[in-house]
Design a protein with these regions (language model features):
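Core subunits and conserved enzymes of cellular information-processing
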Residues: 2-215
């Protein structure tokens, strides 16, 4: 059962180590493809207008209590998460850089070309699609083993520390983050809740599918 997956699978296009700036073409291709799906999913959540992602809610909540913008706080949160990588033994790679670039581009493209659904039911459907897309995309790029974005690296590090399933670790992390953000005054929508509870299982599903297809 994919919900019990504890480790990032290794396939024939996985990099031997995260710190690899000369990966095989197939490794780089799947890394970028996964990140494109990830960014598309993030963009679809924004377009759905059903609520922000948990980490955005945290940044919003913090902005209501300190004299800093949501953008600056989002950056500071990412830096803080990266600092937590150190005791967890996580190492950056080319995907750590590509994560920021590709996801940002895909979000902008999605916002520009994907219209917001005209009724709430379709907005909810789009939110479900967005969470699934983020999870599967995340699973694909993590299997490439070229490093991870701040939140995904934290998830992997905490999984190794606790030995809990990836779905459990990611779900607990996202639910904790959105809870703190909501407590601080951040706005929570149904899309936020779907993301917080659904992203863990969806990442695990992505890992499971890649493992089944390539092993």
């Amino acid at each position: 059962m994919f919900l019990k997956i504890k480790n990032i699978p290794k396939v024939n296009w996985s990099s031997e180590k995260p710190y690899n700036f000369k990966p095989k073409f197939s490794t780089l291709f799947f890394c970028c493809f996964g990140l494109m799906l990830f960014g598309l999913g993030e963009g679809l959540l924004i377009v759905s207008f059903t609520g922000a992602s948990p980490w955005s809610v945290l940044a919003q909540g913090l902005s209501l209590n300190v004299n800093l913008s949501i953008g600056i706080l989002t950056f500071l949160i990412s830096v803080t998460v990266l600092i937590f990588w150190i005791p967890l033994g996580q190492k950056p790679g080319i995907a750590t850089i590509l994560n920021a670039l590709i996801i940002a581009i895909m979000i902008d493209l999605c916002i520009k070309f994907v219209p917001t659904p005209s009724n709430y039911i379709n907005q909810l459907i789009l939110a479900v699609i967005s969470v699934t897309t983020v999870g599967i995309g995340g699973g694909i790029y993590l299997v490439a083993n070229l490093g991870a974005g701040p939140r995904d690296g934290l998830m992997v590090g905490l999984q190794k520390l606790t030995n809990f399933p990836i779905a459990t670790v990611r779900g607990t992390l996202e639910i904790s983050v959105v809870s703190v953000g909501w407590y601080l005054g951040g706005t929570v929508g149904i899309g936020t809740i779907l993301f917080a509870f659904g992203i863990g299982p969806c990442v695990a599903l992505g890992l499971f599918l890649v493992n089944r297809l390539f092993n």
